[in-house]
Amino acid sequence: MGRGKVQLKRIENKINRQVTFSKRRSGLLKKANEISVLCDAEVALIIFSTKGKLYEYATDSCMDKILERYERYSYAEKVLISAESDTQGNWCHEYRKLKAKVETIQKCQKHLMGEDLESLNLKELQQLEQQLENSLKHIRSRKSQLMLESINELQRKEKSLQEENKVLQKELVEKQKVQKQQVQWDQTQPQTSSSSSSFMMREALPTTNISNYPAAAGERIEDVAAGQPQHVRIGLPPWMLSHING
């Protein structure tokens, strides 16, 4: 037969209760020492009997050190729990505020769109109308400003294009002028070149005069002795002249 589960309850018999306390206390102190030695743990055990007698155990007999450490830990834990509780409360409060603000904004947006106006009275409708008129004024003012800026930008571009056009027209006129001068120069250049070549050739080949030379064979000596000199003009042949003028 297996051992059944023992129900824990207060021992009514005073003597039996005292004997049980003595046995369990000794076993508890022994277990505290074992866990301290085996597991290198800091253990502090405090027991008060029904008569108020103190029984204690502390690792390395440093009860004050362990209790001080316990107090620091307990205080830090309490502060952390308190801070978390305050933070959670603040977050809940902030959430409620933001939620109400979002609902108000959504409601105002619907009113501006002309929706859900049944809940508004005459004064609220007048305020809404004034708000819409002010909004329209700001919108129109901004629209006019943008249109004016656009017009100024177009005028600036127009002026820039006009200046570029003037520069291009000036360059075109100069180019046409140069081309006209070039054509005129090309037309006059052949005549000037021909006249210069003919003049230079005539200077290089002057007319040759032959006089006072002895008579060639077959001529009459009397004609020579008569004292009349013979002048012979030697000119260029026609083919050479046509070549020079050509």
Swiss-Prot record:
<dbReference type="GO" id="GO:0045944">
    <property type="term" value="P:positive regulation of transcription by RNA polymerase II"/>
</dbReference>
<dbReference type="GO" id="GO:0000978">
    <property type="term" value="F:RNA polymerase II cis-regulatory region sequence-specific DNA binding"/>
</dbReference>
<feature type="region of interest" description="Disordered">
    <location>
        <begin position="180"/>
        <end position="199"/>
    </location>
</feature>
<dbReference type="GO" id="GO:0046983">
    <property type="term" value="F:protein dimerization activity"/>
</dbReference>
<dbReference type="GO" id="GO:0005634">
    <property type="term" value="C:nucleus"/>
</dbReference>
<keyword id="KW-0238">DNA-binding</keyword>
<feature type="domain" description="MADS-box">
    <location>
        <begin position="1"/>
        <end position="61"/>
    </location>
</feature>
<dbReference type="GO" id="GO:0006357">
    <property type="term" value="P:regulation of transcription by RNA polymerase II"/>
</dbReference>
<dbReference type="InterPro" id="IPR033896">
    <property type="entry name" value="MEF2-like_N"/>
</dbReference>
<dbReference type="GO" id="GO:0030154">
    <property type="term" value="P:cell differentiation"/>
</dbReference>
<keyword id="KW-0287">Flowering</keyword>
<protein>
    <recommendedName>
        <fullName>MADS-box transcription factor 14</fullName>
    </recommendedName>
</protein>
<dbReference type="Pfam" id="PF01486">
    <property type="entry name" value="K-box"/>
</dbReference>
<keyword id="KW-0805">Transcription regulation</keyword>
<keyword id="KW-0539">Nucleus</keyword>
<comment type="function">
    <text>Probable transcription factor. May be involved in the control of flowering time.</text>
</comment>
<keyword id="KW-0221">Differentiation</keyword>
<dbReference type="GO" id="GO:0000981">
    <property type="term" value="F:DNA-binding transcription factor activity, RNA polymerase II-specific"/>
</dbReference>
<dbReference type="InterPro" id="IPR002100">
    <property type="entry name" value="TF_MADSbox"/>
</dbReference>
<dbReference type="InterPro" id="IPR002487">
    <property type="entry name" value="TF_Kbox"/>
</dbReference>
<keyword id="KW-0804">Transcription</keyword>
<dbReference type="InterPro" id="IPR050142">
    <property type="entry name" value="MADS-box/MEF2_TF"/>
</dbReference>
<dbReference type="InterPro" id="IPR036879">
    <property type="entry name" value="TF_MADSbox_sf"/>
</dbReference>
<feature type="domain" description="K-box">
    <location>
        <begin position="88"/>
        <end position="178"/>
    </location>
</feature>
<dbReference type="Pfam" id="PF00319">
    <property type="entry name" value="SRF-TF"/>
</dbReference>
<comment type="subunit">
    <text>May interact with the K-box of MADS1 and MADS6.</text>
</comment>
<dbReference type="GO" id="GO:0009908">
    <property type="term" value="P:flower development"/>
</dbReference>
<keyword id="KW-0217">Developmental protein</keyword>
